[in-house]
Amino acid sequence: MGEHFLLEMVDITKEFPGVKALDRVQLKVRKGSVHALMGENGAGKSTLMKILIGMYKPNEGKIIFDGEEVTFNSINDALDKGISMIHQELSPIPEMTVAENIFLGREPTFGKSGLVDNKKLIEMTRNLLESLEINIDPRKKMGELSIANTQMIEIAKAISFHSKLVIMDEPTSAITEKEVAQLFKMIESLKKKGVGIIYITHKMSELDEIADDISVFRDGKYIGTDTAKNLTRDDLIKMMVGRELNQIFDKPEPKLGEVILSVKSLTKQDYFEDVSFEVRKGEIVGFAGLMGSGRTEVLETIFGVKEAESGEIFVNGQKARIKSPQDAVKNNMGFLTEDRKLTGLFLPLSVRENMITVNIDKYINMGWLNGKRVKKDCEQQKQKLYIKTPSIEQIVENLSGGNQQKVLLARWLLKNPDILFLDEPTRGIDVGAKSEFYNLIFELASQGKAIVVVSSEMAEILGLCDRILVMHEGKVTGELTREEANQEKIMQYATGQAKMAKKLHVHNNFEQTVTANKIEIG
């Protein structure tokens, strides 16, 4: 691991009223390295970083930075020493230019006049961006940039403070695969300049590419540190949650019933063609494939979000006419969408209000909402799904990702559908929350619900599903039973390298390219 460290955080303890958030935590970061922090939500990663940048004061412990013991009373104290943080929620000023955002409050001026020297400002910004190999016009408005480019500018801003250590919090959560590659290239450039990077992520697939060292935290405690090459996925999962990988997918034997959903030759131009599959009661069918293969669009078309050009849908043997999501709901279908914040939840509303949005009719009698019954049912779902919230009146935006996803599931459980579509059901939630969610899915299947899952996580598809349909460029190229399925076979079908040898049965959208030797959990 090396003997000289850019950063040492020693025996850091932080207490809030009634809660010990950090308990004698350690962290050592080498100069010119990427040090990944792993752990579930609530493990203590964010609290530790807030102490490092001066937002919180520790109750105990010390921080040694660049060989000197330091105390930070504010974010500016940390910045002055060369520590900066790129937050997950970016907050640039959209009306300002790139140059104005980077050097806000530090603009070059004409002598004592106080007037900004715009020519010099542009020149300083251009030189900074060129040194980081960022090809963005300094005069461009921040509001015109993509999320990825906004992130690049935030990193450039951090470097403009002559930062020796940059903290990146979930930097790839909202950018494309191509943009991720661009970000990783930039990180490598920073490493060569001797900058240390603390990299917070849930995505294990990124660790092979970017991390030099990994530290794991659990329940406010430091679990351990090792080089990335010495830690397997199973090692990390066990360190993070205290359980083996096979315990996370504790799948019971399925009890399959009659065919409840049958899709025949479904086609949506420019998205997918001739998709056919069946799902039985109690069965979990998964759709795998690369980004753009058509998985999500298949679900959206069955659910009436998109209109099919041709094909038929049968529910319980009867032909179903589904032209809208309302039609799908009438056919006892439910749909957890891919982006819970954009197309699923109403973030400013309460847990209770979100739960009843598709069920409100059953609570209205003679024009009046039966608030007592609503409260009773919502409280039951809160208990049943172990939703961690002080109250069903809590604003849903304030919940963790895992609990937000449970609120969405509760919405559909109140509707009690026979067929449930889950599109990327655990995206953005940590390993422990995923394990809880998987158990809920298994329980629903044991009750006879038919479940169709789209997931970009190979381990999730393999661990959840009784049968897996693989898509490539809008077509179903393979179907595998649970016993037949493995990473290599799925990737062969997903990349078009294998010919389909079995009859059809399909599904939809498998995102980022997953190489055969990588499993992403988190």
Swiss-Prot record:
One of its GO terms (cellular component) is plasma membrane. Belongs to the ABC transporter superfamily. Carbohydrate importer 2 (CUT2) (TC 3.A.1.2) family. Part of an ABC transporter complex involved in carbohydrate import. Could be involved in ribose, galactose and/or methyl galactoside import. Responsible for energy coupling to the transport system. Its main location: membrane. CDD domains: ABC_Carb_Monos_I (cd03216), ABC_Carb_Monos_II (cd03215). Its EC number is 7.5.2.11, 7.5.2.7. ATP binds at residues 39-46. Keywords: ATP-binding, Cell membrane, Membrane, Nucleotide-binding, Repeat, Sugar transport, Translocase, Transport. Residues 7-244, 254-498 form the ABC transporter domain. It catalyses: D-ribose(out) + ATP + H2O = D-ribose(in) + ADP + phosphate + H(+); D-galactose(out) + ATP + H2O = D-galactose(in) + ADP + phosphate + H(+). SMART domains: AAA. GO terms for molecular function: ABC-type D-ribose transporter activity; ATP binding; ATP hydrolysis activity. It is found in: Cell membrane. This is Putative ribose/galactose/methyl galactoside import ATP-binding protein. Gene3D superfamilies: P-loop containing nucleotide triphosphate hydrolases (3.40.50.300). It is a peripheral membrane protein.
